[in-house]
Amino acid sequence: MKKQLMTSCLFAAVLAAPAFAEDADVLQSRLNQVNSFHASFTQRVTGAEGGAVQEGEGELWIKRPNLFNWHMTTPDESVLVSDGKTLWFYNPFVEQAIANWLKNATGNTPFMLITRNSAADWGQYNVKQQGDSFSLVPKADNGNLKQFTINVTANGTITGFTAVEQDGQRSTYQLKSQKNGPVDDAKFHFTLPKGVTLDDQRQ
């Protein structure tokens, strides 16, 4: 009986693997339809028990594969910019900026996954499609991300995404007023403001 059960489980796993791969291909194909866009977004962070932890809003510019500008305007301003080589994080309140090599940035965060849209990245997840919603669960249980869901239409427009961490904290982003098309490269250049301290970790 145990042998039969094990055989059934293995057979089910073999059948599921191609389905996960096909759904990942659909997701990547949809995202590839729009390689540059601008959108505004709202953010809602809730704790494991569902209580609101933070709400905010901001703007987002993306030009795949490696250019992006994520500007959180409320409740506290912060800026995350990639110029293709360096990843800049700027916090105006503390007057500090941090610089890291983009190639060293983790690929298991929702924003990096969406921006890079790399087959190698998606291959690290079991992807399941339900209409315009794609649920991703890491194959390796060694990170902080428990589950990631992205909503993207058939024409490549991202309407929102949600990340659930291992401790149950949930971050939900709703995108609106998305404008697909060319984005000025100036949006992806970061100039250190006068008087701001730079923590340069590109060593």
Curated annotation (Swiss-Prot):
| Leader sequence residues | 1-21
For this protein, the record's CDD domains field holds: LolA
Q: Which domain of life is it from?
A: Bacteria
Which cell locations does it reside in? Periplasm
Protein's UniProt keywords contain Chaperone: yes
S-S bridge residues: none
Q: Which GO terms describe its cellular component?
A: outer membrane-bounded periplasmic space
A Gene Ontology biological process term? lipoprotein transport
For the keyword Nucleotidyltransferase, the answer is no
Alphabetically ordered keywords of this record: Chaperone, Periplasm, Protein transport, Signal, Transport
| Homology family | Belongs to the LolA family.
Q: What does this protein do?
A: Participates in the translocation of lipoproteins from the inner membrane to the outer membrane. Only forms a complex with a lipoprotein if the residue after the N-terminal Cys is not an aspartate (The Asp acts as a targeting signal to indicate that the lipoprotein should stay in the inner membrane).
According to the record's subunit comment, the protein's assembly and interactions are:
Monomer.
- Any idea what this protein is called? Outer-membrane lipoprotein carrier protein
